[in-house]
C-alpha cells in the first residue's frame, strides 16, 4: 500500500484530504505542522507529500526544499483550500501509477 504524507495545520482540511486519499486505497499519515512533517519523513516511507499553500513559521517552498533534501524520491504536491480535491486525488493516483510526476 502506498503511503502519502498530508501536511496541513487546519485539521478539517487535512482530514478531508486524508479521507479522499484513503478512499483510493492509500495509507495516509497526517502532520499538523512543518516540524511534524519533517519528523514523519524520518520515520516513514512515502511516495508523495501534500503540502498546503500556507504554513505558520515557514514557507511551503522552504518545507518543500527540506523534504527534497531529506527524501528526493518523494513527489511533493501543493494543494490550496480552494483547489479541487478530486484533481489532487487524481494527481496522487497518477504518481502512484507512474503516469505523472508532481
Regions from the PLM with identified roles:
Residues 1-11, 17-18, 49:
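Conserved acidic segment of CheY-like receiver
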Residues 11-29:
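Two-component/phosphorelay signaling modules centered on CheY-like receiver
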Residues 14, 47, 51-69:
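Conserved phosphotransfer microenvironments
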Residues 32-48:
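Acidic, metal-coordinating helix/loop segments flanking the phosphotransfer/catalytic sites
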Residues 35, 54, 87-91:
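Conserved N-terminal glycine/acidic-rich loop preference
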Residues 49, 64, 73-83:
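A short, hydrophobic beta-strand element within the central beta-sheet of small alpha/beta folds
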Residues 85-102:
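Receiver (REC) domain switch/output surface
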Amino acid at each position: 500500500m502506498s503511503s502519502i504524507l498530508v501536511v496541513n495545520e487546519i485539521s478539517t482540511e487535512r482530514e478531508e484530504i486524508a479521507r479522499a486519499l484513503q478512499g483510493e486505497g492509500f495509507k495516509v499519515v497526517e502532520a499538523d505542522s512543518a516540524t511534524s512533517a519533517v519528523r514523519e519523513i524520518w520515520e516513514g516511507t512515502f511516495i508523495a507529500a501534500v503540502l498546503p499553500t500556507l504554513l505558520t513559521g515557514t514557507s511551503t517552498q522552504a518545507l518543500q526544499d527540506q523534504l527534497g533534501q531529506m527524501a528526493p524520491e518523494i513527489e511533493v504536491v501543493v494543494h490550496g483550500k480552494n483547489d479541487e480535491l478530486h484533481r489532487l486525488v487524481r494527481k496522487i493516483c497518477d504518481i502512484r501509477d507512474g503516469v505523472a510526476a508532481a
